[in-house]
Amino acid sequence: MRRATYAFALLAILVLGVVASGCIGGGTTTPTQTSPATQPTTTQTPTQTETQAVECGSGKVVIWHAMQPNELEVFQSLAEEYMALCPEVEIVFEQKPNLEDALKAAIPTGQGPDLFIWAHDWIGKFAEAGLLEPIDEYVTEDLLNEFAPMAQDAMQYKGHYYALPFAAETVAIIYNKEMVSEPPKTFDEMKAIMEKYYDPANEKYGIAWPINAYFISAIAQAFGGYYFDDKTEQPGLDKPETIEGFKFFFTEIWPYMAPTGDYNTQQSIFLEGRAPMMVNGPWSINDVKKAGINFGVVPLPPIIKDGKEYWPRPYGGVKLIYFAAGIKNKDAAWKFAKWLTTSEESIKTLALELGYIPVLTKVLDDPEIKNDPVIYGFGQAVQHAYLMPKSPKMSAVWGGVDGAINEILQDPQNADIEGILKKYQQEILNNMQG
């Protein structure tokens, strides 16, 4: 997910333009074609194991989404499996290309769906606007423990649960196996690889790494700093640990990179074989495969400093199935959503067919998942990710962080990084208050 969704957030993402973020599907993808508005599914024969475990509701459950056609196909297939197990329930998917606007218009008038699918970045603003239905009565400690910690955090806002998680994404190192025989296990090993391949005279570089708030969050937050504290709802650019992270990036990594930090340029450098490694997310894998690169995926390695180990903490996003306020069939919707997000076979299907990174912890130990280098590699990276903030106030932070980065990039070697970050800290605070 790049942060077009986070500026949408962002990352990202943020993934939506890649400028400030990485993207998160469901929330990260913009459909390239519109599916029929309403798509009920058909049924197929259930397996005996599933029949013994499933909880069934009855009636219709309507799910709004803005998925890509290939994503929708897989979700419909899973819904068909569920309806075969539960013949009294009907799962209906409705395509809404402008999903946010559609939800904001429909839910207050009682015309919204039961469920909708998007990334976790909406949970704060939608909860604040009264557009979500709490599911506290259904959520148990045992259920929570089935999910990775980041996913547990993503599904709640200010003490209430509003959604269930089914996938995550973050950035990791994608490396060219023809150039890197053993991926780096520490930052020192990573730096040695960068030094080996850095040859700017021949337009070859040590690493490809897009430069924006989302992508460098891993290092900016590695030493305990942060852009924004979701609990206190305060920015942290002026924290010593954040300043240390920025200084580390621009003194230890930037010198081995091409001088242009935009996403497309950095990705092209790796795809053309002009860098041994790239920092990117699962959304980039199709391009890597098309380039014919023999690649692997591993988490960004820990930085060893003063005898301590500091893991890079890139922002991560979680894909959720939300419960809409005014839900018409809450019991049936809960039972389907719980099945979808906790069934090992369902989550494996999403992972193996769509490349979704599981947050159902028991699936990460599945042999098929472990043998998939992309899914397993990003899955390990998710364990070190820092959940992208959920507070609506985060919207004021992205621009400030990118502003600081752009000012540093004017002269990275001589920039007053501490002074610049403190300047933009105050700018963010002013924007939050104004």
UniProtKB/Swiss-Prot annotation:
Superkingdom field:
Archaea
Instruction: Show the ranges annotated as biased composition (Low complexity).
Output: 29-52
- GO terms, biological process: maltodextrin transmembrane transport; maltose transport
Ranges where the record places region Disordered = 28-52
Family annotation (PROSITE patterns)? PROKAR_LIPOPROTEIN (PS51257), SBP_BACTERIAL_1 (PS01037)
What are the boundaries of the signal sequence?
1-20
Q: Name one GO cellular component term.
A: ATP-binding cassette (ABC) transporter complex, substrate-binding subunit-containing
> Coiled-coil intervals in this record?
none
One GO MF term attached to the UniProt entry: maltose binding
Q: Does the keyword Transferase apply?
A: no
| Keywords of this entry | Signal, Sugar transport, Transport
The family database entries (InterPro entries) matched by this protein are listed as: Maltose/Cyclodextrin-bd (IPR006060), SBP (IPR006059), SBP_1_CS (IPR006061)
Purpose of the protein: Involved in an abc transport system for maltotriose. Binds maltotriose much more tightly than maltose.
**Family as reported in the entry's similarity comment:** Belongs to the bacterial solute-binding protein 1 family.
**What name has this protein been given in UniProt?**
Maltotriose-binding protein
Give the gene name.
malE
